[in-house]
Amino acid sequence: MVAVGAANWPGHDDGVRFYEERVLPRIINVACGKQLEPLRRRVCAGLTGDVVEIGFGSGRNVPCYPPAVTRVAAIEPADLSWKLAARRVTAAGVPVQRSGLDGQALPFPDSSYDAALSTWTLCTIPDPAAALREVRRVLRPGATLHFLEHGLAPDEPVRRWQRRLDPLEKRLAGGCRFTEPIAELLTTAGFTITELDAFYQKGVPKFTGAYSLGTALSP
């Protein structure tokens, strides 16, 4: 659900661009706010060393970084999201630097990070498979990707609703999709899933609340 620069894709008119650049980041900042902090703390637990976070958004994960994190490279294309993150970045106990705009083309050498973090990002990034290949490339062997994503539900009746609603969701939420198969994407990209909690988030419709939270090992 993170806004990852959909307004820069071909075919966007000025009205859509204004919505996705000036309005949507504010909506996401509120919608993915305090109520999700317990999940953020779960997914951030165990992060250590130099971390790359794709889909940084407005920095909602920053207060949840554990003390073992030494530095964070934030990948975030939306200028407004980065502005909304300013206070959290300033208050962070570790250096956080906006280091790139596109999770599909990370500006780092191979094997340069100890861990990676992705929360509500693979649903929106145009080519999640490419992004995961890039994350794997920049992670050191044996490093861990921590993920918290919503995606394709385990139950077919819910999946049918997800497929029906996907076109509307893409339009309203900057390209976000309900139907990404998170575990399959990870394994296809070469990761080994070491922990996976797949569940329906309480308080939201199942078609948008099919969550996958866990860790995956880089080869």
Identify what each model region corresponds to.
Residues 129-141:
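A short glycine-rich, Lys/Arg-flanked "PGG" loop and its adjoining helix->strand segment in the class I
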Residues 142-150:
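Conserved beta-strand signature within the Rossmann-like core of class I S-adenosyl-L-methionine
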Residues 101-116:
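A short acidic, Gly/Pro-enriched loop at the edge of an enzyme's catalytic core
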Residues 174-190:
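Short alpha-helix
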Residues 52-105:
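Class I SAM-dependent methyltransferase SAM/SAH-binding core
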Residues 191-219:
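Core SAM-dependent methyltransferase catalytic element
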Residues 27-50, 60-64:
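Conserved alpha-helix/loop element of class I SAM-dependent methyltransferases that forms part
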Residues 114-127:
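A short SAM/SAH-binding and catalytic strip from SAM-dependent methyltransferases
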